[in-house]
Swiss-Prot record:
It comes from Francisella tularensis subsp. tularensis (strain SCHU S4 / Schu 4). GO terms for cellular component: cytoplasm. Homodimer. CDD domains: ASKHA_NBD_PanK-III (cd24015). K(+) binds at D130. A monovalent cation. Ammonium or potassium. The keyword Kinase applies. The gene is coaX1. ATP binds at D6, M7, G8, N9, S10, H11, I12, H13, T133. This is Type III pantothenate kinase 1. It is found in: Cytoplasm.
Length: 258
């Protein structure tokens, strides 16, 4: 079985593949994961056991990380506690054509999502929207040319910034509001948060497609993708897009002996 991990700024998303099938998924706050290799190793083994994963069957590990200061500890934990050399996805481990961008600046999670999207839709121009800590737009052509896109604060990050910057405002649960014109402060915040982000999504998509000059197939992923499932923005929502991209990159690089 293959252990894959998407280490993000807010959450670590862990998946276990048996062949091409995900048999277990676990999500924890990144802040809850201690930073030493021993603490990480114990945490990973415990988390997998609690989800009925047979640790003895794990024979490979692929990682996407946008938290560089945790990479060494995470890699060391996998080596020490699973006796596996982990594979880290990067610009150097993909056959995406990244010549149009500053490739070293592109996050591993964005690379993984593009790899997975291309595998699912090999003959389409694609727009991948990842709604996580940040909301990112990535455009990749049917010829596997990565064109990048845009980045804006994510839904939760926007809410946190609002509440931290305005002393009389407090946090709210993030849900789609029933109305745009709120009747109290909480519904005001929900309305601004939801419809403000929705407007940004629609406008960034419109401008991206206009600049690209051709229709695109739009895939959403990330923790907040489902929040906008009723809106006419995405062609599909793929919650495990990054995990599947890590798996594909791991298998491709194993063939090359990397």
């Amino acid at each position: 079985m293959l252990l894959v991990m998407d280490m993000g700024n807010s959450h670590i998303h862990i998946g276990v593949f048996d062949g091409d099938r995900i048999v277990s998924q676990i999500r924890y706050a990144t802040s809850s994961v201690d930073s030493t290799s021993d603490q990480m190793g114990v945490f990973l083994r415990q988390a997998l056991r609690e989800n009925s994963v047979d640790l003895g069957k794990i024979d490979g590990c692929g990682i996407s990380s946008v938290v560089p200061h945790l990479n060494y500890s995470l890699g060391s934990a996998v080596i020490k506690y699973f006796n596996i050399k982990p594979f880290f996805i990067s610009m150097d481990t993909t056959d995406l054509d990244m010549s149009a961008v500053e490739a070293h600046q592109v996050g591993a999670d964005r690379i993984a999502s593009c790899i997975s999207a291309i595998a699912d839709h090999p003959n389409k121009d694609l727009l991948i929207i990842d709604l996580g800590t940040a909301t990112t737009f990535d455009l990749v052509t049917k010829d596997k040319k990565y064109l990048s896109g845009s980045i804006m604060p994510g839904v939760k990050l926007s809410l946190n910034a609002l509440c931290q910057g305005a002393s009389q405002l407090s946090s709210v649960t993030i849900v789609k509001p029933e109305v745009a014109i709120g009747y109290d402060t909480k519904t005001n915040i929900r309305s601004g948060l939801y419809y403000g982000h929705l407007g940004a999504l629609k406008e960034l998509k419109r401008r991206s497609v206009e600049e690209f000059g051709s229709p695109v197939y739009t895939i959403a992923t990330g923790g907040f993708a489902g929040l906008f499932k009723e809106e006419d923005i995405f062609n599909e929502i793929s919650p495990d897009l990054i995990l599947r991209g890590i798996r594909i990159a791991f298998l491709e690089n194993n063939k090359k002996g990397v």
